[in-house]
Amino acid sequence: MKFLSLLLLAGIAQAIVPPREPRPPTGGGNKLLTYKECVPRATISPRSTSLAWINSDEDGQYISQSDDGALILQNIVTNTNKTLVAADKVPKGYYDYWFKPDLSAVLWATNYTKQYRHSYFANYFILDIEKGSLTPLAQDQAGDIQYAQWSPVDNSIAYVRGNDLYIWNNGTTKRTTENGGPDIFNGVPDWVYEEEIFGDRFALWFSPDGEYLAYLRFNETGVPTYTIPYYKNKQKIAPAYPRELEIRYPKVSAKNPTVQFHLLNIASSQESTIPVTAFPENDLVIGEVAWLSSGHDSVAYRAFNRVQDREKIVSIKVESKESKVIRERDGTDGWIDNLLSMSYIGDVNGKEYYVDISDASGWAHIYLYPVDGGKEIALTKGEWEVVAILKVDTKKKLIYFTSTKYHSTTRHVYSVSYDTNVMTPLVNDKEAAYYTASFSAKGGYYILSYQGPNVPYQELYSTKDSKKPLKTITSNDALLEKLKEYKLPKVSFFEIKLPSGETLNVKQRLPPNFNPHKKYPVLFTPYGGPGAQEVSQAWNSLDFKSYITSDPELEYVTWTVDNRGTGYKGRKFRSAVAKRLGFLEAQDQVFAAKELLKNRWADKDHIGIWGWSYGGFLTAKTLETDSGVFTFGISTAPVSDFRLYDSMYTERYMKTVELNADGYSETAVHKVDGFKNLKGHYLIQHGTGDDNVHFQNAAVLSNTLMNGGVTADKLTTQWFTDSDHGIRYDMDSTYQYKQLAKMVYDQKQRRPERPPMHQWSKRVLAALFGERAEE
């Protein structure tokens, strides 16, 4: 392995010539973006193609759907195609489908009912393509199956119903668990694991040879319940008593669900419970499961302690059921992100390895780790970060990935050889651009997606030749022509330097008819959460922010600033906010606003800030500083006190209340002077059916402000009946954005020398100072 380590110093291969000239969305016409074109979603936007690649004898094959609904097997290189499922065999109103690996059958999901962000209930049917027969996965199903997945090699399907695990094989079904119920989840995550750990709806994993199934069991017994009332409940006439949804929702320092690791032998139905001893049961989070073999020899899980600042990778030998910690890490200088990036690659110079991403060096990079434990091998290094692994090609010994090597706001696609350690760009990595790629099943081809800042496009390449595209997949020529009719906002990117030395990325939008000799109102639009990124070179969506920049009656300048704590600028920059969320972030937004005001065109009397979710929290914390810089603010679906938010997200960054009581008290929005002293107004928007950031946050915040003396001319609270975190129920999003537009219009019209005054206030002043107050 010395060979690999020495070659780490090998040079990076020469960058290729870009395949086409850039096509900046400069407009050039006279039309201005309108409200209806931008809100609630951008109607003028780039198109993109996403392919369902198929692993078959021919590389480059994928499934598409014809205009009449038939499913077609196509080869993207040869343009040959074959109808696999005729239109009359496609179930009406289906939600999704998955082909059996040998393409002999299709699993359909129908009768979709949404549950949480990723999960849903459905009926499932199996279509035998040769026979044309459609068979229900469960004869008595009633739209109640939670998840189903084909085995990678045979006729088996694992599915979850009623929180119990079942195995279907050629028409025969075996129930493998009997304890599923309201508090026990087999093979699917509960709410908090779905939302904060896996970001998906399953917790089961077939071995590569299909002989074993690893799955997790979650026990919510004792986890506190949160009740969400639904006042209309999607009915024309509201029920006399609201429907109440009870969710086991662990808040900070409350009891978390416990988790167990299980192995199931598919053929024998023998189940084994694997003791998880990496951390005590009440101090354990399992973040990832991955098979570390080409068959079923070993499987591993990533374990964290409760506050997710210590990590252990535990390998399990399937035959002996023996567990071994093969890697561990202390991340108590901040937190450890769950990147879900482990992938087995097999033999390298006589030793088995898997690949993973770690920021232990201070920057997120790719490493090879021995399956049985031992010294890791760094494949990438430097003061930049690997964002995602796109593909592992074990035959060519190449790992394809995206990174921020050029700049933290950019993404370029590279390959790195774990045989020679040579890193090669697949794109021109000397330009400010944002790329990603989708690789065919065998890795012979890829669709390169250029996503900004110019007009996006997609091209097909062979991995044998990254210099010349085989064809254009999506040109977006029509979008380019459409944009030529418009005079668009002027978008630019730059950095500002903090007194402490760090730099903050800024995205600025100027009105299309910007005149540096005029005064312009400004709206800051942060998100600002840990590890997030808003300022990037990706396509500038022509959304609400572009609308308020373009409307002649508004003409706002917008600034989006990625504060400390946000992503892709290294671990130190991220971890600075640990244990005190909202403190440095608010300081950075205030600093940026003061830098903005060095521009003569910035109207100091009309500087606003609007954010959603964490951005709504950050808006409130920024106004709380009472800096005098911001004159109005809008918080949409904000957290107001992280003691009211879920444990697995919050404790990752704040630890528990017992460990950080003062930090939680300071993080809560509790100081009212900044709101009382606003020259303008503060608006809170929240959905009453929000199962993520509960409406409780807005209720507590508005009560804090009202009881603290914030007057009615400074504060408005708007709720949206039964809407979730996205505020999409009924016509809520339409009303919401109209309210936002009215808010920024009213704030622009506000005159500091003569603020709007209600007749009651006029009468009070008249009584105190005489009739002159009425003038």
UniProtKB/Swiss-Prot annotation:
Superkingdom of the source species: Eukaryota
Localization per Swiss-Prot or TrEMBL: Secreted
Annotated EC: 3.4.14.5
Annotated InterPro entries: AB_hydrolase_fold, Pept_S9_AS, Peptidase_S9_cat, Peptidase_S9B_N, Serine_Prot_S9B/DPPIV
GO molecular function, one term: aminopeptidase activity
Residues carrying a glycan: 81, 111, 170, 219
PANTHER family the UniProt entry points to: DIPEPTIDYL PEPTIDASE 4-RELATED (PTHR11731:SF162), PROTEASE FAMILY S9B,C DIPEPTIDYL-PEPTIDASE IV-RELATED (PTHR11731)
Recorded coiled-coil stretches: none
Family from the record: Belongs to the peptidase S9B family.
Leader peptide range in chain numbering: 1-15
Any one GO BP annotation for this protein: proteolysis
Annotated protein name in UniProt: Dipeptidyl peptidase 4
Reaction(s) catalysed by this chain's protein: Release of an N-terminal dipeptide, Xaa-Yaa-|-Zaa-, from a polypeptide, preferentially when Yaa is Pro, provided Zaa is neither Pro nor hydroxyproline
Catalytic machinery residues: 613 (charge relay system), 690 (charge relay system), 725 (charge relay system)
UniProt keyword terms in alphabetical order: Aminopeptidase, Glycoprotein, Hydrolase, Protease, Secreted, Serine protease, Signal, Virulence
GO cellular component: extracellular region; plasma membrane
Known role: Extracellular dipeptidyl-peptidase which removes N-terminal dipeptides sequentially from polypeptides having unsubstituted N-termini provided that the penultimate residue is proline. Contributes to pathogenicity.
Protein's UniProt keywords contain Nucleus: no
